[in-house]
């Protein structure tokens, strides 16, 4: 196989020209009062004409994808603490962007963007990060490789991932899901705890389960989906609160309280899971026995989330304590808006309230994207509600916006 010799930055520049002619601190320390910076007023339309939504989705999706791609090789706007990892295409930060980008490609059939994704995957030799092969974060890029395998029928696109998954199946992890009972490790690719050999934190349910379902689809071997399905439900049953209809980030937050005395439910953490559920459902074989269970969880989570949307259309970084971080937060809002829009578009959420919440969320998202496509107001890498500035931008935030735009492109059709 002839691999491209282009550097990622060069690939990005070529495409852009053609198209445009987790810290270890305790929850108490992580959940701090928001910065005193005043949020700019955000005017959110109560309703948007259908033609306006479709045209806005097309504009936002195209500009966000193009802007983000043009930044590769020049990610100076990202804090130095996470810049190197953001530049690594195999790491979850960039992989989350590709999950949104491939969804956008499916919606638009954009061949130039598809070519870009192929070149990135070839440059990485379709490989995962192997320093911690069990870690869900490092399975996120597999979703793009498997997307390419299914779309183009290229066997080499999924073989390295298959080798890793087969190893995991041969030596399945024998640890519990309690983050507090496990030991952390240091290093470039660290573990918050040994439980991360499994999917013991909310983010993991976005990063890994869909890839295991995709592997079954491309290989026709049910063992991958069986493992992914089992581990998803182990984590979901452990982290989901039936009382609130929300996911705890991990076990360390079961008893944590925000400043107002309410439980700590992280906006983006819930967004990760809520965006993942529709994409997992789509990968299930016809008649899969767990489909109804996924839809039931989706509905419970949707109800919990819809009740917490702010008047400005955003979901707060701290879902039960909106005063903790008063500024917009677009990554969580993007993931949640995508999930809700998917439910409306697929006839699962049929009431007018759901439609209104989606349109309000989408209108808020559009206010956070600049004319040239930069996605602002994105909370940086973390695991709990942290302060957000307007200039904060990250690849997964763009991925979230692309997911939402892909559904708004077909809104109510």
UniProtKB/Swiss-Prot annotation:
S-diacylglycerol cysteine: lipidated positions: 22
An individual GO BP term: carbohydrate metabolic process
Residues in the signal sequence: 1-21
Entry protein name: Unsaturated 3S-rhamnoglycuronyl hydrolase
Main location: membrane
Iron-sulfur recorded as keyword: no
Species: Alteromonas sp. (strain LOR)
Location of this chain's protein in the cell: Cell membrane
Lipidation (N-palmitoyl cysteine): 22
Alphabetical keyword list: Cell membrane, Hydrolase, Lipoprotein, Membrane, Palmitate, Signal
Active site residues of this protein: 203 (proton donor)
Membrane topology qualifier: Lipid-anchor
GO molecular function list: hydrolase activity
